[in-house]
């Protein structure tokens, strides 16, 4: 699977019926730029936030992004391994 841009990923989620409030979309881009995270890591943080919280939680999302960037995590696979190892989520 090729990496989608954040915009493409959000459109994909919307096509599956998930609706983001307008402020959430802005916050997603804020977090991406604030942490200088790649699209792949940003999308993974969105995915894991939704799985853990069952809705978009901006502070949880930014916290994940910060952890991923601080630990030099660059792929979805590595991000999922990281949250499993740190027991941040039960996935």
Language-model-detected regions and their locations in the chain:
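Long, charged low-complexity interaction segments
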Residues: 1-37, 76-77, 84-91
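Short, cationic/aromatic linear interface patches
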Residues: 45-91
